Amino acid sequence: MSGNDYYEILEVSRNASAEEIKKSYRKMVFKYHPDKNPGDKKAEEKFKKISEAYEVLSNPEKRAAYDRYGHSTFTSGGASGFDFTSGFSTDFSDIFQDFFGGGFGKSQRASSREHLRGSDLRYDVEVSLEDAFKGIKVPISYVTNVKCSSCSGIGSEGAVNSVKCGNCNGAGSVRTRKGFLTIEEVCNVCNGEGEVIKNKCRRCGGSGRVRNEVSLLVTVPKGIETGNKVRVNGKGEAGFRGAQEGDLYVYIRVKEHKFFTRRSSDLHCSVPIKMTIAALGGEIEMPSIDGSWTKLKIPEGTQSGDQIRMRGKGMPEVNSKDRRGDMYVHVTVETPVKLTKQQVDLLKKFEEESSANCSPKYQGFFQKIKDIWRDISSG
């Protein structure tokens, strides 16, 4: 190995804390790992140096000796040489857990039944906006692994009669070589149990579970939105040989409504009103999401594009007993068509008698245009 300074190799200062050393090591070991750099001899050599440096600096006693006596103490001529090919004493389990698809060692895998837990499942449900408003129970059906009824999930005929697994010799895990590392993985014969059932259940073959259809009612709470999910505990895949069941996650999609547009807990809608109501004010009846009709007051002088707020007429908030959003009514003033002669005469008379105060935006707009042209002409 090269005589490079261990602190320089790990890119830390000599007074770096143990956590800083570990953090830098994790970052560098991912970058230079041989499996991520196949055929790259420089990366392989760098990885060896990183591992050697961390082997020393992560150990308080070795680090103290290194700081006191220098690098030669840990080379082949020193008191504690580092043999890379013999394997690491460093625990890589937390570092490479995701890198190799799982943890290392029996302590994490074979000693726990967590890996035997059934998988979580996903189911997609579409509901109407009205159903999302009031809440609904939705019947669903799906096929998955369920607990075997013949053996009650234990996987054996009668009392369990187990023998040591011949594949892992009872360890629950097997070791395989991956480049420079020895990787410990769950035994695929006994699934980490270390033993196999001698008198396997004929129906499930010893797994404790069989394929079957599951039917249930899922409660969709009021106020639910697209993208929300409902968790149903224990309704996922059955665990292996009596291990914990997974959960079912029901993902919700709320259909688009023909009249209302939803924004969080608020509802928006567009409503046309007559010109006379817009000018004089009045009341119109509005449909609500709960199916009822509500009177909406239109202020005099209402313009197209104005927005009128109806408090508490929106969607209920999830997990709230009484709180609701608001409904926003976007007004469009409709110009009358197919007028009678009398109506035309009345409008002409109105136009003759109208002043600038009646249409301030209109008058202001054309006055602004006149001013612009006057400035251009005078210039």
Swiss-Prot record:
Superkingdom of this protein's organism: Bacteria
Subcellular locations according to the entry: Cytoplasm
Zinc finger (CR-type): 135-213
One GO cellular component, as annotated: cytoplasm
Keyword Zinc-finger in annotation: yes
Cofactor note: Binds 2 Zn(2+) ions per monomer.
Sequence positions that bind Zn(2+) 1: C148, C151, C201, C204
Cofactor section: Zn(2+)
Keyword presence, Signal: no
Subunit annotation: Homodimer.
Purpose of the protein: Participates actively in the response to hyperosmotic and heat shock by preventing the aggregation of stress-denatured proteins and by disaggregating proteins, also in an autonomous, DnaK-independent fashion. Unfolded proteins bind initially to DnaJ; upon interaction with the DnaJ-bound protein, DnaK hydrolyzes its bound ATP, resulting in the formation of a stable complex. GrpE releases ADP from DnaK; ATP binding to DnaK triggers the release of the substrate protein, thus completing the reaction cycle.
Record's protein name: Chaperone protein DnaJ
Species per Swiss-Prot/TrEMBL record: Anaplasma marginale (strain Florida)
